[in-house]
């Protein structure tokens, strides 16, 4: 099952932007993130081709369609109806979309593959490039440790000052 682009609602999404909480196709990703300096900094991860359906944790036969947060299990429709009776009806369950994501550090040349998929999806339409024929895809490695940037006035938490509280008291 492919996820449709949240912006145009017609093409298959190839990236997910966490800041916008949106899955976007190549064309909409370029429109949203390339034309705006602030939006271009948004962290986006590639959406992989849908994976095979995981099997139900109970019967291990049928494809799982639900995930129960409380039980921590993936369930098919039949097992979900059997397991979640009585008081268990209140368990929060989620639909499994079978949509994998590709983190930049998982595969070599991930940005290149994303660019190729984007080119195939556009099939001949003009695309922005960085001047030497390569498409500019600034992907961030989510597996790397974040770098802490100290700006003037950003060290209030370190000094024990609660910036959200009007009664700033030094912690002992």
From Swiss-Prot:
Basic and acidic residues: compositionally biased ranges: 148-158
Residues engaged in binding Zn(2+) 1: 5, 8, 28, 33
GO process terms (BP): cellular heat acclimation; cellular response to blue light; negative regulation of photomorphogenesis; regulation of DNA-templated transcription
Stretches with biased composition (Polar residues): 120-132
GO molecular function: DNA-binding transcription factor activity; transcription cis-regulatory region binding; zinc ion binding
Gene3D superfamilies the record matches: Classic Zinc Finger
Cellular location(s): Nucleus
Record protein name field: B-box zinc finger protein 18
Organism: Arabidopsis thaliana
